[in-house]
């Protein structure tokens, strides 16, 4: 029988992988090229998803709590990234000297997996509204939801 914490982590993984899937559909079907901060958020979503899957299908309460804590920390990093994209980077003519651009280029992921991590737009050009709300704010909202979903995993009581 799975615990509530394991089910929460599995749901977190589903949300995060779903967010990346939606981002890829936006990019490849609706021709919305991503900026450096967009692809960095994809990386954070994938990291959360993997960590959450390990905790959701791994064994033991300690591993589940550690994975919950890592998920919460990564979600907090995602909140910062999405907020920076919305409040600062989206108003810059170029984001080629920001942390996200240097980090993504430095990892080599943009060249190794360009269909997923390729940087094809400036942050200003990548500003898109969906249902009247900027894409970065949707991402920020999901990171906040994931953060609060991970907290009961970390601080909850034993196996329930």
Descriptions of predicted regions:
Residues 22-27, 77-92, 109:
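C-terminal TM-helix exit segments that contain a strictly Trp-centered aromatic cap at the helix terminus
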Residues 29, 58, 87-88, 155-156:
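Helix-loop junctions at the membrane-solvent interface of multi-pass transporters
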Residues 118-160:
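A hydrophobic membrane-anchoring alpha-helix module
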């Amino acid at each position: 029988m799975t615990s509530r914490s394991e089910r929460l982590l599995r749901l977190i993984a589903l949300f995060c992988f779903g967010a990346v899937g939606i981002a890829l559909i936006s990019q490849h079907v609706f021709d919305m090229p991503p900026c450096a901060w967009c692809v960095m958020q994809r990386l954070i979503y994938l990291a959360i998803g993997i960590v959450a899957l390990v905790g959701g299908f791994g064994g033991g309460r300690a591993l589940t709590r550690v994975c919950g804590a890592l998920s919460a920390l990564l979600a907090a990093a995602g909140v910062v990234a999405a907020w920076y994209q919305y409040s600062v980077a989206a108003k810059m003519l170029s984001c080629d000297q920001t942390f996200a651009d240097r980090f993504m280029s430095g990892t080599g992921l943009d060249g190794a997996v360009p269909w997923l991590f390729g940087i094809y737009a400036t942050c200003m050009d990548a500003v898109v509204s969906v249902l009247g709300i900027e894409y970065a704010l949707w991402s920020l909202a999901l990171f906040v939801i994931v953060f609060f979903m991970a907290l009961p995993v970390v601080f909850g009581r034993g196996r329930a």
